[in-house]
Amino acid sequence: MTQESLLLLDRIDSDDSYASLRNDQEFWEPLARRALEELGLPVPPVLRVPGESTNPVLVGEPDPVIKLFGEHWCGPESLASESEAYAVLADAPVPVPRLLGRGELRPGTGAWPWPYLVMSRMTGTTWRSAMDGTTDRNALLALARELGRVLGRLHRVPLTGNTVLTPHSEVFPELLRERRAATVEDHRGWGYLSPRLLDRLEDWLPDVDTLLAGREPRFVHGDLHGTNIFVDLAATEVTGIVDFTDVYAGDSRYSLVQLHLNAFRGDREILAALLDGAQWKRTEDFARELLAFTFLHDFEVFEETPLDLSGFTDPEELAQFLWGPPDTAPGA
């Protein structure tokens, strides 16, 4: 790759320019090849952008994965979190990528250096592909139980990091406080829920300190959506969990929000199987607490949920509809 190609990075000088180029195959492929060459790693014949993502990601055939971090869209924070997560997970009993190397595309120039990580590629297919591609309900539920076991092991990983993933980190509770202050107006703008329900939400939502009281911090992956989990449905195996830019020392209940509403698409029978595999006791307040975490989550969590929620006016009924046992009547 020539110096001219590196200079193309100067085109990314704002959130808008980053957004328009972040998943551009033609733009990133030569840069990813340069990254592998600089690390002395084999350069595969094929590098492709697997789909839409927050950070530029290219996947090699058959290996590896290259992930680049810009200065926009929380890139510096994402790099710090992901780097810390890989250090913490290095010997953990969970299927995660191996970190093969790291570097910068243009170090020491005074401009943004464009750091990158190179990781091993996960085998299997994404959870989303497996769920969409099977009619074997029992196999899918068995896989959800296995995912629950893996999730339980992830939550028990010791918090040995130095910033975000430490037992006394305040990043997670501060995030929840910020979300509590903003969530009602955000949901008004997103439009998935009725104004009458949102009018009641401020009084219904618990105080963050009350919600977290007595909870031991755990390793929490906050973005377990349908393409961040890799599986082998036929073998009932979870083959990989990826993307550690949204990790916290926090409350394990938070990790269920994207998992259920995005990956499971709100299917409560699949959620019940996962909880069974994780040996997660469903308390009397489970649905109410999980709806609270739904509203405190950092993402637009209903975006991929194929459920019409607009008829609900009572948060308690919405809690049971989304998070109650699978035999609970909808109530809307």
Curated annotation (Swiss-Prot):
EC category: transferase
Catalytic activity from the UniProt record: hygromycin B + ATP = 7''-O-phosphohygromycin B + ADP + H(+)
Family annotation (SUPFAM superfamilies): Protein kinase-like (PK-like)
GO MF terms held by the record: ATP binding; hygromycin-B 7''-O-phosphotransferase activity
InterPro entries, per the entry: AGP_Transferase, Aminoglycoside_PTrfase, Hygromycin-B_Kinase, Kinase-like_dom_sf
One GO BP: response to antibiotic
Keyword tags: Antibiotic resistance, ATP-binding, Kinase, Nucleotide-binding, Transferase
Residues of the active site: D223 (proton acceptor)
UniProt-listed Enzyme Commission number(s): 2.7.1.119
Transmembrane segments: none
Protein task: The aminoglycoside phosphotransferases achieve inactivation of their antibiotic substrates by phosphorylation.
Family to which the UniProt record says this protein belongs: Belongs to the aminoglycoside phosphotransferase family.
PANTHER family xref list: AMINOGLYCOSIDE PHOSPHOTRANSFERASE DOMAIN-CONTAINING PROTEIN, AMINOGLYCOSIDE PHOSPHOTRANSFERASE-RELATED-RELATED
Protein name from the UniProt record: Hygromycin-B 7''-O-kinase
Organism: Streptomyces hygroscopicus
Upper lineage: Bacteria, Bacillati, Actinomycetota, Actinomycetes, Kitasatosporales
